[in-house]
Amino acid sequence: MKAQKGFTLIELMIVVAIIGILAAIAIPQYQDYTARTQVTRAVSEVSALKTAAESAILEGKEIVSSATPKDTQYDIGFTESTLLDGSGKSQIQVTDNQDGTVELVATLGKSSGSAIKGAVITVSRKNDGVWNCKITKTPTAWKPNYAPANCPKS
């Protein structure tokens, strides 16, 4: 008798079934991971502007996100993000009330995942110098674990 070479059909079917089960578990986990990572990155990009905002407040200048600020204004130095709606400096909406309160707002869009697209990140400063972060207007596919601990969904 000749020795068997190769695999039987049932062995191949078992391997395909195992790979299918592993993929069914891994793909949703990976999608959640990428969504969390994108939200965390966007929050970090917006939060990084707090230092520039503090400098503007100390100098008594109005905080703006503009390529051509006036002498009485301070550009926070934001560069374009692939995760936020809009283009260039307009991706960040700045509200400076000139009383020490500031609000930096960005909307997730562009290349961000569909589960997080449209969520709004707001980083705000009270006049006592305390900064807060919150995420609002989340899409229906949003999961609670997407928001980082330092910027909860409200």
Swiss-Prot record:
- Transmembrane ranges, per UniProt, are 7-27
**Propeptide part(s) removed at maturation, as residue ranges:** 1-6
Q: Where in the chain are disulfide-linked cysteines found?
A: 133-151
Task: Cite the Pfam families for this sequence.
Answer: N_methyl (PF07963), Pilin (PF00114)
Where it sits in the cell: the answer is: Fimbrium; Membrane
Q: Which domain of life is it from?
A: Bacteria
InterPro entries assigned to the protein according to its UniProt record, in alphabetical order? Bac_GSPG_pilin, N_methyl_site, Pilin, Pilin-like, T4P/T2SS_Core
Q: Which Gene3D superfamilies match?
A: Glycoprotein, Type 4 Pilin
Concerning PTM, the database record says:
O-glycosylated; glycan consists of 5NbetaOHC47NFmPse(alpha2-4)Xyl(beta1-3)FucNAc in beta1-O linkage to Ser.
Q: Which UniProt keywords apply?
A: Disulfide bond, Fimbrium, Glycoprotein, Membrane, Methylation, Transmembrane, Transmembrane helix
Q: Name one GO cellular component term.
A: type II protein secretion system complex
Please give the family membership noted in the entry. Answer: Belongs to the N-Me-Phe pilin family.
Q: What is this protein called?
A: Fimbrial protein
Phylogenetic placement of the source organism: Bacteria, Pseudomonadati, Pseudomonadota, Gammaproteobacteria, Pseudomonadales
